[in-house]
């Protein structure tokens, strides 16, 4: 079996920055708390919790009865709405903002466009943390999720009657789907449309790698958390190109791969390299695989 590694694997800059900063706080014995997962990777989150990180699903679930002088609130890589930020600053003496710089740039762009009179259309998932943080900064907006009905969007805009519309995206969405939505919006009559592709370049490059692996391999192993938007997207891209994609977090989740002569390996941007290495080693030793690095290193 030949095992082909994607050119880029592991954490992106924003995720690595957030994880390493959280580890430093925990090593300093800070009482670190966060609303939601730092990253959407179950293995990474278990390690951080084992180090002492306290994770709460929402603001109302935070227990303030045991806060101490060394307590610190963390704003995760996806960002937080201004209301949440203000609340944390009031209740904690120290707040560490680990919002990904690329995500923060999207927040700033959206606010600037709104100030210029644009009605904001967001291509993203309404329950995703990044989208929630973005919406908390805007006065009015429309979220367009995958699988949208464009006639419904047209009807909404006819009723809303905006003169100008600005399209932006959650940073981890599928770039091809974004472009298709942009193309449809640009055809609307009587509305000035500004298209702003705010999808992260790292995720766009991973999409291209997923397509390349699907075109050159018999199957592709996609390594990453089950709740990771960008990891799940890679698996869907592979399958859309007619190849089997196995979205796994550990070797135990892999099926029998003996029927495949060439298997690709790619990861989401919230997947640590040690997680990828475990799966690579398992495939290599189980199937006597030859690793083709293709520029990729683990």
Swiss-Prot record:
Q: Where does dimethylallyl diphosphate bind?
A: 40, 78, 128, 228-230, 270
Q: What Enzyme Commission number does this protein have?
A: 1.17.7.4
Binding annotation for isopentenyl diphosphate: 40, 78, 128, 228-230, 270
User: Catalysed reaction per UniProt?
Assistant: isopentenyl diphosphate + 2 oxidized [2Fe-2S]-[ferredoxin] + H2O = (2E)-4-hydroxy-3-methylbut-2-enyl diphosphate + 2 reduced [2Fe-2S]-[ferredoxin] + 2 H(+); dimethylallyl diphosphate + 2 oxidized [2Fe-2S]-[ferredoxin] + H2O = (2E)-4-hydroxy-3-methylbut-2-enyl diphosphate + 2 reduced [2Fe-2S]-[ferredoxin] + 2 H(+)
An example GO BP is: dimethylallyl diphosphate biosynthetic process
**Co-factor: note:** Binds 1 [4Fe-4S] cluster per subunit.
Could you tell me which InterPro entries the record lists for this protein?
LytB/IspH (IPR003451)
Provide the binding site for [4Fe-4S] cluster: 12, 100, 200
| Residues the entry annotates as binding (2E)-4-hydroxy-3-methylbut-2-enyl diphosphate | 40, 78, 128, 171, 228-230, 270
Q: In which pathway does it act?
A: Isoprenoid biosynthesis; dimethylallyl diphosphate biosynthesis; dimethylallyl diphosphate from (2E)-4-hydroxy-3-methylbutenyl diphosphate: step 1/1; Isoprenoid biosynthesis; isopentenyl diphosphate biosynthesis via DXP pathway; isopentenyl diphosphate from 1-deoxy-D-xylulose 5-phosphate: step 6/6
The keyword Metal-binding appears for this protein = yes
The name on file for this protein is: 4-hydroxy-3-methylbut-2-enyl diphosphate reductase
Which organism is the protein's source?
Answer: Kosmotoga olearia (strain ATCC BAA-1733 / DSM 21960 / TBF 19.5.1)
Supply the source organism's classification.
Answer: Bacteria, Thermotogati, Thermotogota, Thermotogae, Kosmotogales
